[in-house]
């Protein structure tokens, strides 16, 4: 199993919630885990907001100094080589769209030596603005890759409507995810289900997720 997982996606795709779940899952399996908050674009949904959770689970957090405020964010500094060597599972949560992926691009050269040990997941949500079709999410994916100077390896279907998410909504999104897979040539590695809905599906790619990230207006 490759131990470096890079998570990208459109704003509101749910990539941060997925990243948090990946880290918690790794820790529950007895692995040493670290999560890098590279989201220096969106002040509302950041992995750094879950510092207490990570401390409880023994997960190492690397984040910008002001990641828990609404201030402009300075560039984040971390030793990606050291983290990759020290941790069983290293998760890098990248900012939304190509603008957020620019920060990842700064580490592309350092990450190159771990190329065979990296999985780069593209998180998609059909129920979000500007990502309703496979063509739209495919175009955005290539823009992210250009900014990041790295290529994705798989797709994560995280289609949801927040608290209104149902089994039907997720199952209906499978054709959208499959078409995205066809256009990009990448496999759909996971389909994310809220943990209370996950047992209702008989599919093989189910990823049960707890909802950690909630809207600031909720």
Q: Where in the sequence are the language-model features?
A:
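Conserved lysine of the Walker
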Residues: 15
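Hydrophobic positions on the alpha1 helix immediately C-terminal to the Walker A/P-loop
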Residues: 18, 22
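Switch II (G3) loop of P-loop NTPases
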Residues: 64-69, 88-104
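Hydrophobic anchor at the beta1->P-loop junction of P-loop NTPases
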Residues: 7
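Walker A (P-loop) phosphate-binding loop of P-loop NTPases
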Residues: 12
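Conserved catalytic-core segment of NTP-binding enzymes
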Residues: 99-203, 216
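Loop/turn-to-beta-strand initiation segments
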Residues: 86-90, 118-119
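N-terminal phosphate/diphosphate-binding loop that engages ATP/GTP or pyrophosphate donors
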Residues: 25-73, 79
């Amino acid at each position: 199993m490759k131990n470096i997982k890079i998570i990208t996606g459109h704003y509101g795709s749910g990539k941060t919630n997925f990243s948090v779940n990946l880290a918690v899952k790794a820790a529950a399996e007895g692995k040493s885990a670290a999560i890098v908050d590279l989201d220096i674009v969106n002040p509302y949904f950041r992995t750094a907001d879950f510092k207490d959770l990570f401390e409880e689970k023994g997960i190492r957090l690397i984040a910008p100094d002001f990641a828990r405020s609404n201030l402009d964010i300075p560039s984040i500094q971390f030793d990606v080589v050291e983290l990759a060597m020290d941790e069983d599972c290293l998760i890098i949560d990248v900012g939304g769209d190509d603008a957020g992926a620019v920060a990842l691009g700064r580490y592309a050269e350092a990450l190159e030596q771990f190329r065979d040990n990296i999985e780069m997941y593209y998180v998609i949500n059909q129920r979000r603005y500007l990502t309703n079709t496979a063509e739209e999410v495919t175009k955005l994916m290539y823009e992210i890759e250009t900014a990041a100077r790295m290529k994705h390896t798989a797709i994560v279907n995280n289609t949801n409507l927040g608290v209104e998410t149902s089994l039907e909504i997720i199952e209906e999104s499978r054709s959208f995810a499959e078409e995205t897979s066809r256009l990009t040539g990448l496999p759909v590695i996971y389909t994310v289900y809220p943990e209370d809905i996950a047992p209702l599906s008989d599919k093989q790619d189910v990823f049960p997720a707890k909802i950690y990230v909630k809207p600031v207006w909720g």
